[in-house]
Amino acid sequence: LEKELPEVDRFYGKFNWKELISDLGKSYHQELATERVLTTPRHYAYVKIGEGCNRTCSYCSIPIITGAYQSRPMEEVVDEVRGLVAQGVKEFQMIAQDLTFYGLDRYKRMALPELVERVSDIPGVEWIRLHYGYPSHFPYDLLPVMRERDNVCKYMDIALQHISDPMLKMMRRNITKAETYELLERMRREVPGIHLRTTLMVGHPGETEQDFEELIRFVKDIRFERMGAFAYSHEEGTYAYQHYKDEIPQEVKQDRLDYLMRVQEGISADVNASKVGQTFRVIVDREEEDFYVGRTQYDSPEVDPEILISKDTPLSPGSFYQVKVIDAQAFDLYGKVLN
């Protein structure tokens, strides 16, 4: 970048922000560390609990960019949430490149369940939603917390990437097909009604038609409530870039991706259709010309389905309402307020 942009006076990496502050002639104040300027609607916020990643997935450049995993101190996270509640935030998306690693570096133990409990105990916290879990060595003691605490959403975003054992090995995922099935079955058994969101990849070097067909069978079998997918990209510096050839043609990758998403669209339509006639607690995000737009506890902002609410009753964005679902499409619900 320095060679390509000689007009730039100074570059700062994401970890040397103290140097930036120093160069600006300001001193760092610890008491300001958790103050936030919200860039989201005022009723929800993203709270990062860790930075970096210690995993060695073949295709991923995040560890190269962010470095080793660093858990934020638990007290710092709790203080940030308290401050956000004081600003009127009700819903918290707890995020990290790898939520499930939280605490292993700082506390020498998996501390995510404890952190979620502590945030859950804060008055004014209405919803907690978790992004992004890692499947291997998942902290199973998180599941009772999700099941028993009303303000912890029955929702888990956990990127699985693939199901074929040969692909999982080539991707360096440190989990098997059998272990993946066991994890998902246990989640659904221990947290009734949980909605699972996952991310899958097609076109990784070495993926055969048989591997792809196995992935399709897996998606049809598990029937994820929410799913995203993408085609493999040969990123410089990754293990895959150094050790594998990007041999699958781009058009094959795209065909596989399109087919996978068509399969999921049918599943999503069925999942949403099953909600017709049911009543859900919904938070209203915004008002549009013909309807209000809200979400249930099973829907994260920006990536999941929304519920479009008729304007029979005036509603306030940021407030909760009981909404009955009256119609459904693959990626949207339609409802009316009961209260």
Residue map of PLM features:
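Conserved, mostly hydrophobic/aromatic
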Residues: 57, 77, 94, 130, ...
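Short flexible coil/turn linkers enriched for glycine and charged/polar residues
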Residues: 39-43, 53-55, 152, 162, ...
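Extended hydrophobic-aromatic, low-complexity segments
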Residues: 154-155, 168-169, 192-195, 210-212, ...
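Terminal RNA-binding accessory module
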Residues: 240-339
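Proteins enriched for Cys/Gly/acidic motifs involved in redox and nucleic-acid/cofactor modification
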Residues: 1-102, 156, 178-185, 189, ...
